[in-house]
Amino acid sequence: MSLDAPSIRKARREDASLLAAAERAIASVPGELASRPNEIDDDAVRKMILDLNDRGRGNYLVAEHAGAVVGHAFLESLSLAATSHVVRLMIAVHEGNQRRGVGRALMNELLRWARSNPSVEKVELQVRSSNERAIALYRSLGFVEEGRKTRRLKIGPNEYLDDVYMALWVGP
């Protein structure tokens, strides 16, 4: 079910506490994020927004609908000269807003930015093997699986999830 298209804007430093709280809520579900809720810090999110948007190391966006932030995502430039053509993508659709077009809207805007940035040639992401909806979204946008790390996340006694590595070439 799709809601009216969310509006997409640049993340601001004052968004950090809200974005960190949303990530903690997502992380409370085993396997959704690699981080545990107590490992997600408001100051780290604030620093990421500063590094990406204010210092030009990438692009950090939020999606809003009816005045509420419903998702966030970013592209982060890799730091080594040999990988400077690659950006890492992270996306989080906030609790209760899945299957409403939020993820696709954020992805479309990030990919538009990546394609218009001459220094970006490749977009990489990782996703849990259990997140079939996200994998389907990424494939529909042209991402291909490049590899898999088996049993990378331990979510319970003798219970593991694979990480799937996907990428999209946007360069020449």
PLM regions and their residue ranges:
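Acetyl-CoA-dependent GNAT
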Residues: 13, 32-96, 107-108, 113, ...
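Terminal substrate-recognition subdomain of acyl/acetyltransferases
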Residues: 2, 158-172
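A short beta-loop-alpha structural element at the N-terminal edge
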Residues: 7-21
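Conserved active-site alpha-helix within GNAT-family acetyltransferase domains
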Residues: 100, 104, 116, 129-147
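Conserved GNAT acetyl-CoA-binding A-motif
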Residues: 107, 114-126
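Conserved catalytic-core motifs of GNAT/GCN5-like acyltransferases
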Residues: 122-127, 139, 144-159
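Hydrophobic alpha-helical core bundles mediating ligand binding, dimerization, or RNAP-core interactions
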Residues: 19-27, 45, 49
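Catalytic cores of nucleotide-enabled group-transfer and carboxylate-activating enzymes in metabolic
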Residues: 26-29, 115
